[in-house]
C-alpha cells in the first residue's frame, strides 16, 4: 500500500484526542487512509493488544484527586507514564469519575470492580484508556475520611483542573459547632497548611515511634561527638526531639496563616470563638508519585526516538 500524505495538523489533533504517541498517531492515520474516527478505533485495538506490555512500564506521573460529599471525603491517585497525559482531558475525566465512585466504594478493592457509566468496571475502563491513550495507567491508591459531624476541608495544589492536581489533601474536623461556614473555612485553611508543611501525624503520640527512636539515636550520637557530658547530652537530645516534633507533628507546627501560633493554638482560639470543641479527626495528604521509582530519561533521546522512522 502506497503511503498517503498525512498532515502534521491531523497527527496533532489525533494525539490531542487520544494522548497516543506522535508516531502511533501517524501510523493509525496511514493505516486508515486518513479517516479520523477509524484511526481512533485503530489505536484502541492496537492499545488493547499492547496493554500487557505497557503494564510493565513505570507510571509515576498522573493526577491525584480530592472529592468531598457531605461528611465523607476521598483522595485517589491515578498514575500515567508522562505529565503530558495528565493534561489530557480524557485522562482527567477518567480520574474524576474514579474519585466520584470512590466515595461510594470506600475501599480500593471495591472501587476497582465498581461499574462506571459505560457499564464497565473501573479496572476495565482503565484498560480501555490504556488502549486509546497509549500509556500504562494504574489506579495506585485511595483513602477515605469520614466524620460523624463537623466539616471536611479539601485542597488540591498545582491544580490542572478543579479538584485534580499534584497534591491532594483532606482534613476532617469533628465538632458540633453551629457556625458551619467558619468551621469549613478553618478546615480549608488547615488543609492548605498540610499541603505545604507535610506533617507526619496529628499529635506526638500517633507519630511512628520507630521514627522517633531513630531521630533520638542520631541526635544522641551527634551530641556525643561534640564531647558534651552525659547529663548535658540528655538535655540536648530532648531539646532536639522537641524541635523535631515541631517540624513533623501537625498540632505542634507553626500555622501557615498565623506563623506566631501553632496549629493547636489556632484550634483552641477557634473553639473559644465558636463555643464548641474542635478535634482534628484525620488528615490525608497524597503527593503524586511519592514512593515510586522514577525512570530517568534523556530528553534528547526521547525526541530522537519520536522523530525516527
UniProtKB/Swiss-Prot annotation:
InterPro entries: EF-Ts_dimer_sf, Transl_elong_EFTs/EF1B, Transl_elong_EFTs/EF1B_dimer, Transl_elong_Ts_CS, UBA-like_sf. GO terms for molecular function: translation elongation factor activity. This is Elongation factor Ts. Residues 82-85 are annotated as: Involved in Mg(2+) ion dislocation from EF-Tu. Pfam families: EF_TS. Belongs to the EF-Ts family. HAMAP family: EF_Ts. Keywords: Cytoplasm, Elongation factor, Protein biosynthesis.
